Design a protein with these regions (language model features):
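Generic structural signal for well-ordered alpha-helices
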Residues: 23-27, 48, 69-72, 101-109
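Hydrophobic faces of well-ordered beta-strands that scaffold small-molecule active sites
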Residues: 1, 38-40, 58-60, 80-84, ...
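Catalytic cores of alpha/beta
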Residues: 45-53, 59, 123
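Catalytic beta/alpha-barrel core
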Residues: 34-44, 57-68, 86, 100
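Catalytic alpha/beta core domains of metabolic enzymes, predominantly
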Residues: 93-138
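Alpha-helix-loop-beta-strand connector modules within alpha/beta enzyme cores
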Residues: 11-40, 50, 77-87
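Acidic (Asp/Glu)-rich catalytic clusters
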Residues: 52-53, 71-82, 115-117
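Glycine-rich, proline-tolerant flexible connector loops at the mouths of alpha/beta enzymes
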Residues: 1-25, 127-133
Length: 138
């Protein structure tokens, strides 16, 4: 479930308040109809905190814990499963496989520092993202 598009080539930033409102409405509907795990896409710690308090199972951070410095603390506190995407503010050039690997290593280092268990982490190479100039600040 996402409240804000993460399309890197569009200007899609919205306020945290709007993002939370969109996600919470969707979560409540899903929770009324199923017991399946719920994953939320967000790179903002305040949003993650709100949805984790509602019982969300997975956080998918397209920035690999690199956008919001508070995100690792929130993940450590609630201990959900975590999807880390290969993320760079710069355009990935050269050997994309090697650069993607390094980006994921950096995210894993951030997670390790925050004592996030590796068994809770899924890595996403984010192929198609950050391969050319984007318009989002994250």
């Amino acid at each position: 479930v996402g409240g804000m598009s993460t399309a890197p080539y569009l200007s899609t930033m919205i306020s945290e308040k709007i993002e939370v409102a969109r996600i919470i409405n969707a979560i409540k509907i899903i929770q009324r109809t199923t017991n399946l795990p719920i994953s939320v896409d967000t790179c903002r710690a305040a949003v993650a905190k709100e949805v984790l308090e509602l019982g969300v199972d997975i956080i998918n951070d397209v920035t690999g814990l690199k956008y919001d410095t508070m995100m690792p603390k929130i993940i450590e506190r609630f201990c959900p499963s975590l999807i880390l995407c290969a993320y760079s503010k710069k355009i990935i050039t050269g050997n994309q496989l090697q650069e993607t690997k390094q980006l994921l290593k950096k995210s894993l280092e951030i997670a390790k520092t925050a004592k996030i268990p590796r068994t809770k982490i899924v890595l996403d190479p984010a192929i198609g993202f950050f391969r050319k100039k984007g318009r989002n600040p994250f």
